[in-house]
Amino acid sequence: MKIKECCTVESQECIAKGIYSMWISTKVIAKEAKAGQFISLFSKDGSRLLPRPISLCEIDREGGRLRIVYRVAGAGTEEFLHLKAGDEVDILGPLGNGFPIEEGKGKRVMLMGGGIGVPPMLQTAKDLGTDTIICCGYRDELFLNEEFAAAGDLHIATEDGSAGVKGNVMDAVREDHLEADVIFACGPAPMLRAIKAYGLEKGIPCWISMEEKMACGVGACLACVCQSTEVDGHSPVSYTHLRAHETLMNL
């Protein structure tokens, strides 16, 4: 069920350069949300008609709260960084398909996140509730690493080599000799392409969350379409979780 709800900001803090963490109190959306889904936040500036899609980092279903971790990338997200406790914000959600947690039950699961694709892996790790392998890739400065370390077996890669393995998440997989039965991943296309190739090579099912520019967030406007081998070229699949080696032509 997707609803538009006026919510209240509980707290917000900067956790890395240009990266912000916000807890939002909701009456309905938190109870319906699943790991890997996202919400759309609406601007109060009338000149910005389209909402901004942001993935869910943590979901407190009993407490009716959502945590988002986002990068300031333009005027819309810059507006959100000024929100403080007690401010109201309109959100639409939950949107997209959550990761198929049942596919990981009783298996060795590796979660792989790159850049701003890192945050949704946190709730995914919590919902799996097992000793999950977590690979996080950063450009330089780390964020959420303490939370991930508490949620599973954390492995880090940084492009500048300042922490963990120098390189990307696939470099960490190879250098740390990591193995898994199932992979869940979210991040930029080059990373997902490398994970797809790895999954094909090893025969590992890979479920991916794609990052695409979008407008409506519900698949009606076709702004987020991606080519697929299983559906026509105009079917919306972004932020839908797909088996990478069976479905995506562009990866």
Regions found by a protein language model. Name each.
Residues T240-T247:
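Conserved small/polar residues in nucleotide/adenosyl-binding loops
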Residues K2-A85:
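Ferredoxin-reductase
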Residues E212-E230, P236-Y239:
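Local cysteine-cluster metal-coordination motifs and their immediate loop/turn environment
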Residues A75-K213:
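FNR/FR-type flavoprotein reductase catalytic core
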